[in-house]
């Protein structure tokens, strides 16, 4: 994807907001796998508000989109509403998938400061499961070099496979 890839954020628009720069605000990922899951989860996200800066009218040329009020028109547990059967399951290895860049704005300058990268599995899982406990669990199961151990419990055939956790819902 050209725009909504793991390396992109809303920094180009966010840094035009003096309040965001002054607060050294974390930038919002526009990585499709993260953004679309967060938007669909909307009002059910534990971390609120969910703000993404986007295009807006002159002279500011930015707009603030608050997706924290979005209500998905269905049961979020039914992954096959959007996903083809089986494509939402955790693969044993992430393969060539890129993790999502994490960054913030430098106070005063508005320059982008890259803090690191979340692994691809952690990125998508914590998009919906964004509470402190879930985020801590994902962090604990990620090695310092970024290797993710999620498949130990969550791949198919394991006790806590995604298909089991969503049993009867897909």
Where are the regions a protein language model picked out?
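Flexible linker/context regions in extracytoplasmic redox proteins
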Residues: 1-71, 80-170
């Amino acid at each position: 994807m050209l725009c909504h890839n793991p390396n992109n954020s809303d920094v180009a628009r966010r840094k035009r907001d003096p309040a965001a720069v002054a607060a050294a605000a974390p930038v919002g990922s526009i990585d499709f796998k993260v953004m679309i899951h967060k938007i669909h989860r909307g009002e059910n996200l534990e971390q609120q508000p969910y703000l993404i800066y986007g295009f807006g009218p002159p002279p500011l040329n930015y707009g603030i989109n608050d997706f924290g009020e979005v209500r998905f028109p269905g049961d979020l547990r039914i992954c096959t509403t959007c996903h083809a059967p089986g494509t939402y399951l955790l693969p044993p290895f992430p393969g060539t998938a890129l993790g999502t860049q994490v960054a913030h704005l430098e106070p005063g300058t508005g320059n982008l400061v890259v803090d690191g990268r979340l692994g691809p599995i952690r990125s998508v899982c914590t998009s919906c499961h964004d509470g402190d406990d879930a985020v801590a669990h994902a962090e604990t199961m990620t090695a310092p070099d970024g290797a993710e151990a999620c498949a130990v419990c969550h791949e198919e055939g394991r006790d806590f496979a995604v298909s089991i956790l969503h049993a009867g819902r897909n």
